[in-house]
Amino acid sequence: MTEEGPGIVSLGKLRRPRMLRLWGICRVQIFSAIFMLMSPAGVGAGAKDDFSLVHPLVTMEQLLWVSGKQIGSVDTFRIPLITTTPRGTLLAFAEARKMSTSDKGAKFIALRRSMDQGSTWSPTAFIVDDGETPDGLNLGAVVSDTTTGVVFLFYSLCAHKAGCQVASTMLVWSKDDGVSWSSPRNLSLDIGTEMFAPGPGSGIQKQREPRKGRLIVCGHGTLERDGVFCLLSDDHGVSWRYGGGVSGIPYGQPKRENDFNPDECQPYELPDGSVVINARNQNNYHCHCRIILRSYDACDTLRPRDVTFDTELVDPVVAAGAVATSSGIVFFSNPAHPEFRVNLTLRWSFSNGTSWRKETVQLWPGPSGYSSLTTLEGNVDGKDEAPQLYVLYEKGRNQYMESISLVKVSVYGTL
């Protein structure tokens, strides 16, 4: 891949923000914690993935960003994304909204990195700056190529057509685990100028056939290209094209309450090689719950007959987190409430998301918004570690956009 101009933004040029007081790790039942501490050593490092070992336990929480002009004079931090690079580095991203809480307006893309499994984080770096654009950038989706080690970050410009006429899908990438980034690449010549809002969340790289190695980034459109659809790359991110999509109903027309209108979405791969896309149900069609789409050809097509509704995943119309581990555990996070963005809850499934375990972990009872998930599995720094789950989410006491917080969860419940 040829980088377009120097465009390298080095971390470390910004001073470390002052330490912030935590709002508290969510409560964990004492007897459950004691039981897990007394469990056999087999559930620690080197343990074989086994559903019977899964007892998610929060082991750490810390704030990464606080709104209110406390970091770099940024008014509001929103839209959290988190990913694990092929080398095991954690990268956390957010929209840094310069002047207001609005989805429109000028922004930075904020980044923090962790190289010690989330214990410590680099100072905030602003890796993209849209200047004073009236309808600036919007995150976004991040995906890594395990073969090349390159991390790709997608975002949109002029998504709302406010003071501008042409939407663009933009891409930056890093070859060194987020230390430096390329200049932005405009994908309009490849995919056109129909508005495509990636994610928000993570893309995936197919780990199984069909199309093993394919990069997939899913998102949603507006009236120009209605519904949920995906970007695909079969050459390690050199070129991108549109794959399958599912349109809203009525197509190309303004939607009303209870119309079918899939929106922000998160893909993950199942053990059989199929791809599930967990989507926001923008107009509460059928239920106050999640729309589930499934593709059996690596998102070349998305068929209406493969669309279902998960009534167990009650949802207040929000961007949620979803991820599948290498052993087939599916995790899901959202504000578990039919109307309000409160009660950020973690759920998990041993049946590919067709059913969910009755036990849950409440991460925050109060105002909570968008969330993003990633896992750290297998060999880390030469050690075979038990799997860890990371939840990056919007958290507040009065409003969910007051901060962005990181929770670390031990999948096997070990400290």
Curated annotation (Swiss-Prot):
The gene is NEU1. Interacts with cathepsin A (protective protein), beta-galactosidase and N-acetylgalactosamine-6-sulfate sulfatase in a multienzyme complex. It is found in: Lysosome membrane; Lysosome lumen; Cell membrane; Cytoplasmic vesicle. One of its GO terms (cellular component) is lysosomal lumen. Its EC number is 3.2.1.18. Disulfide bonds: none annotated. Pfam families: BNR_2. Substrate binds at R78, R97, E264, R280, R341. The lineage of its organism: Eukaryota, Metazoa, Chordata, Craniata, Vertebrata. Gene3D superfamilies: 2.120.10.10. Belongs to the glycosyl hydrolase 33 family. N-glycosylated. Phosphorylation of tyrosine within the internalization signal results in inhibition of sialidase internalization and blockage on the plasma membrane. This is Sialidase-1. Residues 1-47 form the signal peptide. CDD domains: Sialidase_non-viral (cd15482). A motif (Internalization signal) lies at residues 412-415. SUPFAM superfamilies: Sialidases (SSF50939). The keyword Transcription regulation does not apply. It catalyses: Hydrolysis of alpha-(2->3)-, alpha-(2->6)-, alpha-(2->8)- glycosidic linkages of terminal sialic acid residues in oligosaccharides, glycoproteins, glycolipids, colominic acid and synthetic substrates.
